[in-house]
Curated annotation (Swiss-Prot):
DNA-binding region(s), residue ranges: 114-205
Gene of this entry: Foxq1
Task performed by this protein: Plays a role in hair follicle differentiation.
Compositional bias per record (Pro residues), positions renumbered to this chain: 228-238
Listed name of the protein: Forkhead box protein Q1
Organism domain of life: Eukaryota
Biased composition (Gly residues): 55-66
Keywords from the named record: DNA-binding, Nucleus, Transcription, Transcription regulation
Lineage: Eukaryota, Metazoa, Chordata, Craniata, Vertebrata
GO biological process: anatomical structure morphogenesis; cell differentiation; hair follicle morphogenesis; negative regulation of transcription by RNA polymerase II; regulation of transcription by RNA polymerase II
GO cellular component terms listed in the entry, alphabetical order: nucleus
Listed SMART domains: FH
Amino acid sequence: MKLEVFAPRAAHGDKMGSDLEGAGSSDVPSPLSAAGDDSLGSDGDCAANSPAAGSGAGDLEGGGGERNSSGGASTQDDPEVTDGSRTQASPVGPCAGSVGGGEGARSKPYTRRPKPPYSYIALIAMAIRDSAGGRLTLAEINEYLMGKFPFFRGSYTGWRNSVRHNLSLNDCFVKVLRDPSRPWGKDNYWMLNPNSEYTFADGVFRRRRKRLSHRTTVSASGYGGGSPPGPAGTPQPAPTAGSSPIARSPARQEEGSSPASKFSSSFAIDSILSKPFRSRRDGTPALGVQLPWSAAPCPPLRAYPALLPASSGGALLPLCAYGAAEPTLLASRGAEVQPAAPLFVAPLSTAAPAKPFRGPETAGAAHLYCPLRLPTALQAAAACGPGPHLSYRVETLLA
């Protein structure tokens, strides 16, 4: 029986509903609507069960000149439904108005007063300096800032954290304990560090010391030296504020490049190259070429044939005759230089045996023959007096 009822539900249900309405039993719920509508929750069923759709369907089905009891009830219920729809629609208006008001509140710009053109260090230092005792607590600093600047009187309160951080993280502020026995206590005083007065110099509150002050004074003195002094009665023109070393005129550049405007010091390159070297221990006039070290008086040696008898058994080795082309480097202090005679530094010594002597005919060039133990020979030369300092290696030719 149920299969026969639910099979033609789409077409037969409307007809059954119209028959029931014609019979005047609209108050009794139909089994089709009770079972089918609850079990099937489609959109069409929801639209059919809605009050507005039901009233519209009742008007259509009970249209014409036929008015039954159900139709009368529907006509009586129509004002209620319309009133209900109006009552349901009426809350939508206030909600829309509230939503619109919320959007308007969000779109309203947030007004914040302009921040004063000072850093927090400057503001805190200003508050401490204006105090009678030269020290204030954190609450007193906040009260001073709120009373002096409108920015701190608004709803924004994040500046209080900035004040606390700047007090505790900068060395220019010193905390003075109210009770030394309770260093962890609050309401301590804050005052300016007397050792950090440079931070508040020239009316400018700086976070740290300026590092370009020395360079600025040196450059200012360098540029000042380039300008020629005027007459005694003529005042010097003051430099303009926009003038800079880069944007100077060509005449200024030529004046700045003159030797008088350059950096004058004993360590300047021009000063070092222009002045000859003078020994501090000796005030005698310097020669044409000066040595950067002290040279010991060493008489010029003759050629090697005169030195041969000094050797025992002819045990000598040839040594490269360095410095023969540069007699000025090995010249003695205050002695005249003989460019014709070759100069040698190491004297002869028979402290160590060496290979037999070979004549200059086999060697093909004139050589100075000295012992193989060259440091001993140099030590013997140093025993006579302070020997010259050699700035290069001694080259030896081993046969």
